Design a protein with these regions (language model features):
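Conserved alpha/beta enzyme-core scaffold
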Residues: 1-395
Length: 395
């Protein structure tokens, strides 16, 4: 492991590489490194023609996060599980300045594990009979995950192959092939002198380990942004990425590059477990400023959210997933109403507690546990939840 500057990290990334970026909305993104990458491109027109891969959206719908890759010529293709946070990348795709692909978020996290394990890819039913399905001859709405004409042209030319339809044991599946990762950009809290990385001040650890393993076993490099380098870690449990996977460590050079989330410099509630009753948890969450203001005006958004709370009360589910957008505040409203008897989960990894909203979405105040994002999607895909409250553009 070698400690380098953000500028030195940016200089390592070569044109044509596939770069995987870890993070989740406003948390866990290596902001200092990606900002330096963008500055290098604007200064030198390098690196060019990158393929950017990320599972959860990472950004503030403005300039931060993976939006740093949103320059014409810098990025050739984008493969992401969520685009709303990455408005600059969306503009590139919609103006045909890059290939754009929208693949299932959970599948992408599982692909990191498959790549790490030397497996050919991920075989799943996730994405069947949706726009991710590549069988355009069956339905004109199927596009293999392509979000623009440039991506569809790449599929037709055989230069892009992110998903295939296959028959397996007499049933139909989608197969997502493994691919090489040349560089993984991850963020943790601290590194020791051997490169072992802790996450004790991070809201969650999403796909850090799987991504680092995937890049390392692809023959690529792993660049980790941290707050500090220490002689040793206080506890073994804090270490989430072992140093054998880490090539370079970058110490954050500006406070704004290592916020806990893009909305909060630090929130102790996201890393502290709480096992009390719902009413008490709601009070703690209120202290942590994650509950909505009860005196706020009653608008259409709040009415929809309260209607979802009524479903929680009526259905009495045991395990619930809350999606991004309007659903993110449902847990806080439910706790505010004193409802209990259920456990809220977020795909980033938190289980229990009160999920945060906005640019802190993905975190949870006083969770009972936090697991890796790929493991959370194992649980979801296997049918582990009783109720999901999701955000949709149109139904």
């Amino acid at each position: 492991m070698k400690v380098i500057t953000t500028a030195q990290a940016a200089a390592l990334v070569q044109s044509g590489w596939t770069v995987a970026s870890a993070g989740f909305v406003g948390a866990g993104h290596a902001e200092g490194v990606t900002e330096a990458l963008e500055q290098r491109f604007l200064r030198e027109a390098l690196p060019r023609d990158l393929t950017l891969v990320y599972s959860a959206g990472q950004g503030d719908r403005g300039a931060r996060g993976v939006n740093h890759f949103g320059n014409v010529g810098m990025t050739r293709a984008v493969v992401g599980g969520h685009w709303r946070s990455a408005t600059r990348l969306a503009t590139l795709a919609m103006t045909e300045q890059c290939e754009g692909f929208n693949l299932p978020q959970g599948v992408l996290t599982h692909l990191y594990r498959a790549i790490a394990g030397g497996k050919p890819g991920v075989l799943t039913k996730i994405g069947l009979h949706t726009f991710v399905d590549p069988r355009v001859e069956k339905d004109a709405r199927y596009h293999g995950g392509a979000v623009n004409q440039r991506a569809r042209d790449a599929i037709a030319a055989g230069t892009a192959n992110w998903v295939e339809a296959v028959d397996f044991r007499g049933d139909e599946y989608l197969f997502y092939p493994s691919f090489r990762i040349d560089c993984a950009l991850i963020r943790c809290t601290a590194s020791d002198t051997r490169g072992n990385l802790s996450t004790h001040r991070e809201a969650f650890h999403h796909e850090l380990l799987a991504m680092a393993q995937a890049a390392h076993n692809s023959g690529g490099i792993v660049i980790a942004q941290v707050e500090s380098v220490v002689d040793y870690h206080e506890t073994l449990q804090a270490i989430h990425v072992p140093g054998i996977l880490v090539d370079y460590v970058v110490v954050s050079e500006q406070p704004g590059h290592h916020l806990m989330t893009f909305a909060e410099a630090y929130n102790e509630a996201y890393v502290r477990p709480w096992r009390g009753e719902a009413a008490e948890a709601a009070e703690r969450a209120k202290e942590a400023e994650v509950l909505p203001d009860a005196s706020a005006p009653l608008d259409a958004r709040t009415i929809v959210q309260r209607r979802a709370v009524m479903e929680l009360a009526a259905r009495k589910p045991r395990v619930v997933n809350l999606g991004v957008g309007m659903p993110a505040a449902v847990g806080a409203l439910a706790h505010q109403a004193g409802l209990g008897g259920f456990t809220l989960t977020v795909e980033a990894g938190p289980i229990g507690g009160t999920p945060a909203d906005g640019l802190s979405f993905g975190a949870s105040a006083y969770p009972e546990a936090v697991v890796d994002q790929p493991a959370q999607f194992d649980f979801y895909e296997g049918g582990g939840i009783d109720l999901a409250i999701l955000g949709l553009a149109e139904l």
